[in-house]
């Protein structure tokens, strides 16, 4: 390359370098005109309508001619006369106090007094001293009970006569059944259980005397001039009849459910009943012997 050609090339290169260094670049933001977007508006309207679930406000205006349901509060109307405190509950007394616009505070006795003082001032009522008495209620009247046993238990129906004798009512049929049940129960036992030794320090045999004595089985006064009156003995919860000075037998007869007058001895047995009781025991002894001597039914004669 010639000298002139090289010089012109260098000049051109220097000019280009100067031009690039002298150029100043300025950045200006580009603004585009916003066009109305109908699609976006329709989508927003649809989404807002689907998300809005709030119900419209209820109108509180009552229109004429339309019956609206009303809530009624039940109220207990108090009676014309105040019942006894034992026959009414505390909650009922409070309802009556609310009916009269009275306070319901306090115990049952206090509420009862407050109600009586306000609305039943002229009525006389029994006021218990303690709250326990106020809670107690009188139960129904007890039904009449007819005794079906041997002795006179508590709670049985008793008939008091002018003479002072108390009689427990028992039908003859029931007495017979009770006597047979008693006899059958003792008959199944051995003879040793129906007899026991007589204590030596007791006065079991009574002598003849004037007047009368009370018989337990007959339930009435009988002449005491006969020989054979005995005094019953009580041992191990059972009643025994003296037979000999060393032995006594079980009482198989059913005593009468009659209580004598006060001061009359009621644990005596007349000679006739002593003989009947001994006869029953003798029959048991004979039957037990016959049962032992009897051959089995499957044995040949």
UniProtKB/Swiss-Prot annotation:
Q: Give the region (Disordered) as residue ranges.
A: 31-85
- Briefly explain the null phenotype: Mutant animals show survival rates similar to wild-type until 16.5 dpc. Then mortality increases and no animals survive beyond weaning age. At 18.5 dpc, the lungs of mutants mice show a thicker mesenchyme and smaller alveolar space than those of wild-type animals.
For this UniProt record, the keywords arranged alphabetically read as follows: Nucleus, Transcription, Transcription regulation
**According to its UniProt record, where is this protein located?**
Nucleus
Q: Function, please?
A: Binds to target gene promoters, including NKX2-5 and SYCE1, but not GATA4, and may be involved in the maintenance of the active epigenetic status of these genes.
Q: Where is the composition biased (Basic residues)?
A: 60-70
Q: Which GO terms describe its biological process?
A: epigenetic regulation of gene expression; lung-associated mesenchyme development; positive regulation of stem cell proliferation; stem cell population maintenance
Q: Where does the SAP domain lie?
A: 85-119
**What GO MF terms are annotated?**
chromatin binding
- Binding partners and assembly: Interacts with DPPA4.
Which stretches does UniProt call biased (Polar residues)? 39-52
What is the protein's major site of localization?
Answer: nucleus
What is the designated name of this protein?
Developmental pluripotency-associated protein 2
């Amino acid at each position: 390359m010639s000298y002139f050609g090289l010089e012109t090339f260098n000049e051109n290169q220097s000019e280009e370098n100067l031009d690039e260094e002298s150029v100043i670049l300025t950045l200006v933001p580009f603004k585009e005109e916003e066009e109305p977007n109908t699609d976006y508006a329709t989508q927003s309207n649809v989404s807002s309508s689907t998300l809005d679930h709030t119900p419209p406000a209820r109108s509180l205006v009552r229109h004429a001619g339309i019956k609206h349901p009303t809530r009624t509060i039940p109220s207990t109307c108090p009676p014309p006369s105040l019942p006894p405190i034992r026959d009414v509950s505390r909650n009922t007394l409070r309802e009556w106090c609310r009916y009269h616009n009275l306070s319901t505070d306090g115990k049952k006795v206090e509420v009862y007094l407050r109600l009586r003082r306000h609305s039943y001032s002229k009525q006389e009522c029994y006021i218990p001293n303690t709250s326990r008495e106020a809670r107690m209620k009188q139960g129904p009247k007890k039904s009449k009970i007819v005794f079906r046993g041997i002795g006179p238990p508590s709670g049985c129906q008793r008939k008091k006569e002018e003479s002072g004798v108390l009689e427990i009512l028992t039908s003859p049929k029931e007495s017979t059944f009770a006597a047979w049940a008693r006899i059958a129960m003792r008959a199944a036992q051995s003879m040793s259980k129906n007899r026991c030794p007589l204590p030596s320090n007791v006065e079991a045999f009574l002598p003849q005397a004037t007047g009368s004595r009370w018989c337990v089985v007959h339930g009435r006064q009988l002449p005491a001039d006969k020989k054979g009156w005995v005094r019953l003995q009580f041992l191990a919860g059972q009643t025994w009849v003296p037979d000999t000075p060393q032995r006594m037998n079980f009482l198989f007869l059913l005593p009468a459910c009659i209580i004598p007058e006060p001061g009359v001895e009621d644990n005596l047995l007349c000679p006739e009943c002593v003989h009947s009781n001994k006869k029953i025991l003798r029959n048991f002894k004979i039957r037990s012997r016959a049962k032992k001597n009897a051959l089995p039914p499957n044995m040949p004669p």
